[in-house]
């Protein structure tokens, strides 16, 4: 099983965090369950392998569309996979569903909505088919980038301060003083929070909390043993009780239970580095 990440070209870097390809060379001999901590990035996914299912706070078992738009995930979720895995994806910046596609981000939180229903333009189906049929990994990534470039040239979107604020929260892993962002925005608190919710789908503070827990999960991913005081120090929690409370709220388990029981993808593949397209 292989998981690869690629960085976007400069013109799209305001909207795209990365592209990824996740695939298995052979069919799985039994159902595989992969879980993920809360996701602080929306995305677009093209499945060219076997159909699979999702379990999250909203859906006990959802048949995931072959191509879909994914909003933020505020709690841990699980994927149930069988057969051959073949998934190509675009990881978007936190506010990009709104900025790039003009979508109401809050409507997509915890959702996997069919791409053909969300974006009805004929070119969407054309690129989706090309991505499925492309044989090479780089070919699939280039087609995803071409798809976004096509849309970008049609709409010519511009980012604003909310995009910047959301990116700062994501890049700092939720470890920042919200007052600094508010002061820099030159907006009232109510206006800032309303505009942030409209473009990202969550309040700034809640988004920062999710991002920080995602960072913690990444620190312990694939490990069998960790130094917990060091982890909550790195994540800037004031005390262990606060750390455990937040972790349980967003994952449903204590940190030690999660470490022992989780089936994150990092347990099955090497942690990827982000490559440039050549």
Segments (PLM) and residue ranges:
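A secondary-structure capping/hinge motif
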Residues: 198-202, 246-256
């Amino acid at each position: 099983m292989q998981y690869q990440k690629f960085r976007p070209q400069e013109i799209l870097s305001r909207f795209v965090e990365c592209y990824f390809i996740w695939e298995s060379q052979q069919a799985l001999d039994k159902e595989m369950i992969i879980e993920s901590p809360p996701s602080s990035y929306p995305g677009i996914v093209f499945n060219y392998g076997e159909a699979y299912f999702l379990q999250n706070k909203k859906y006990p078992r959802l048949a995931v569309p072959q191509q879909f738009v994914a909003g933020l995930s505020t709690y841990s979720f699980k994927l149930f996979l069988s057969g051959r895995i073949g998934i190509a994806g675009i990881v978007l910046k936190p506010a990009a569903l709104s900025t790039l596609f003009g979508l109401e981000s809050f409507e997509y939180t915890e959702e996997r909505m069919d791409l053909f229903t969300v974006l009805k333009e004929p070119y969407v189906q054309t690129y989706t088919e090309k991505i499925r049929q492309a044989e090479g990994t780089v070919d699939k990534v280039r087609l995803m980038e071409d798809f976004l470039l096509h849309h970008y040239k049609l709409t010519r979107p511009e980012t604003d301060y909310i995009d910047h604020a959301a990116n700062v929260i994501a890049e700092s892993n939720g470890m920042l003083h919200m007052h600094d962002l508010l002061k820099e925005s030159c907006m009232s608190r109510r206006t800032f929070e309303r505009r942030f919710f409209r473009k990202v789908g969550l309040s700034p503070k809640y988004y920062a909390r999710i991002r920080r827990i995602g960072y913690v999960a990444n620190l312990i991913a694939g490990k069998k043993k960790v130094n917990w005081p060091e982890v909550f120090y790195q994540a800037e929690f004031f005390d262990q009780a606060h750390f455990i409370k937040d972790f349980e709220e967003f994952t449903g388990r204590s940190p030690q239970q999660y470490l022992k029981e989780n089936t994150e993808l990092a347990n099955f593949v090497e942690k990827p580095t982000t490559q440039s397209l050549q």
